[in-house]
Amino acid sequence: MLDPSIDSLMNKLDSKYTLVTVSARRAREMQMNKDAQIENPKSHKFVGKALEEIDAGLLTFEKENR
């Protein structure tokens, strides 16, 4: 079982594509700056930490209106 679950993550964002994009960008940012917002992450990988931040509500995304 993955933690956080895809169901809880999909409640935070509107699509799987958005979830992947936001978490990948945040993971790259963490690799460069070493600044995780979660104090005790369960995952040791950057993408896992980014997903935990999304699930905790620390990382949000607003859709751009075109």
Curated annotation (Swiss-Prot):
Which EC number(s) are documented for this chain? 2.7.7.6
* Catalytic activity, reaction form: RNA(n) + a ribonucleoside 5'-triphosphate = RNA(n+1) + diphosphate
Q: Name one GO cellular component term.
A: DNA-directed RNA polymerase complex
Has keyword DNA repair? no
Q: Which GO terms describe its biological process?
A: DNA-templated transcription
Classification via Pfam families: RNA_pol_Rpb6
Gene3D superfamilies, from UniProt? 3.90.940.10
Mark the transmembrane ranges: none
- InterPro entries noted in UniProt: DNA-dir_RNA_pol_omega, Pol_omega/Rpo6/RPB6, RPB6/omega-like_sf
Q: Which UniProt keywords apply?
A: DNA-directed RNA polymerase, Nucleotidyltransferase, Transcription, Transferase
Family note = Belongs to the RNA polymerase subunit omega family.
Q: What does this protein do?
A: Promotes RNA polymerase assembly. Latches the N- and C-terminal regions of the beta' subunit thereby facilitating its interaction with the beta and alpha subunits.
Can you name this protein? DNA-directed RNA polymerase subunit omega
Tell me the classification of the organism that encodes this protein: Bacteria, Bacillati, Bacillota, Bacilli, Bacillales
